């Protein structure tokens, strides 16, 4: 069970945290990561692209010339694919690209991504992130203090509009959330928009202490 230092927004060490091997110390499975990233990217597609076939373009109802005796190749319509302004052969049509992953694969992919960040020393644990006002300068300073200027990904333990909007003008910065809550019938649920693609596409992954503890609670054995 690795132990990581916990820093404040100025990058100074303020404590330690024990990370579970079940979440941050597993083997990095590139095959599962590939499956998860492919599914995520496919699910972002709208699938609305469309082309017209020869039956959908206007015109072409008349045979351009008689079948034999002209010296030309025989043609039945000026809207066949080989003609200018003709229909498209085998073109795309609207369809769903959605790929569904089972819970076991999603869980394994997220654990693998987190373990990879930890092994690459691209994981930072921050005690808490509090802003008194909207301040992009403060967030840029925090990213610099933890050496995460390039494409940082921040995972908060609550929805904080000040932090979200303060990071909006930071190039490449991504803000996600992972915390526990209750639904309308009082059941405990996990609220999260953390995904494997964002983790792999980021530079350093910055977790608040509470978010890291909740992730270990949910995904630890």
Predicted regions span which residues?
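A short, flexible low-complexity segment enriched in Lys/Arg and Gly/Pro that occurs
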Residues: 33-68
């Amino acid at each position: 069970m690795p132990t990581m230092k916990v820093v404040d927004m100025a990058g100074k060490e303020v404590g330690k945290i024990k990370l579970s091997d079940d979440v941050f110390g597993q083997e990095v499975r590139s095959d599962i990561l590939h499956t998860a990233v492919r599914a995520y990217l496919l699910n972002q597609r709208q699938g609305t692209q469309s082309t017209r076939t020869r039956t959908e373009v206007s015109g072409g109802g008349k045979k351009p010339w008689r079948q034999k005796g002209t010296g030309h190749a025989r043609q039945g319509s000026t809207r066949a694919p080989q003609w200018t302004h003709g229909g498209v052969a085998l073109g795309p049509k609207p369809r769903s690209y959605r790929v569904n992953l089972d819970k076991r694969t999603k869980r394994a992919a997220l654990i693998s991504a987190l373990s990879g960040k930890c092994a690459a020393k691209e994981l930072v644990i921050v005690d808490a992130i509090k802003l008194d006002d909207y301040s992009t300068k403060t967030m840029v300073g925090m990213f610099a203090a933890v050496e995460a200027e390039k494409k940082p990904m921040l995972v908060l333990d609550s929805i904080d509009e000040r932090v979200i909007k303060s990071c909006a003008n930071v190039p490449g910065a991504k803000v996600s959330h992972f915390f526990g809550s209750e639904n309308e019938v009082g059941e405990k649920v996990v609220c999260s928009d953390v995904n494997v693609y964002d983790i792999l596409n980021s530079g350093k992954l910055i977790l608040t202490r509470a978010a890291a503890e909740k992730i270990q609670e949910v995904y630890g054995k």
